[in-house]
């Protein structure tokens, strides 16, 4: 690489071409293979000793959801924020850092101290961080989920929106990053505020909305079901929108729907994309599946059908 503003393998790959890039990788590997840095079984075993299984108790699996069906807030949290565990009687709990009014992934020092204490009480002293900008208590006994939920609520860490529209991935953007072409956090704030209705979000279902302030793509916009990329046009901030991106075993790069938008237009753009999805989806179909079945044409048509008012410019920092 020769440009710190474009420090990504994808940019180097495009510049060199697949064949030349592959040739150089293979040449480098031939030089390194069987060298002094080769991982031996002895070294593997040494490191593995630090990752022994926890002292799990012998427990029976509990149908917590069935026993708490009448408690809708808790049931919603169980549905979105609690995941199955390979050990009977345990669950993995995601702590949402996506409460409306808070920058995606942000936590205060007090919240982090609180989570550290919870980890000691509920999860063998272990906390994990996800690339979706949330936290995980990976080993919680199912019988203690209700108690944990109540404690998380007291610190604003129990928003039941994991995997939903407001579980936004966003880079710091122009407010905090010198490489950014545009702000990301005010866009995330405006979208979260516009769709701050958990019933609506649960109806929309699984959807990944990712925002990056520049082509370095720290917000993974290119693999978001809806991706937003900040771009610079003659010193002004604009936002390019793509749909159909996906991560995981069915990974895909999103396709750009058309010309970019100003910051004040973005919540309405997202609204029109969701309207198209609701009108076109079949039962049980996720947003990304609808895009995969129909392509971007119906989404593009609806978004650009009528002009979107420019509105007021985004504030310097919606979270200040």
Predicted region positions:
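Peripheral terminal and linker regions in Fe-S/redox and tRNA-modifying enzymes
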Residues: 1-320
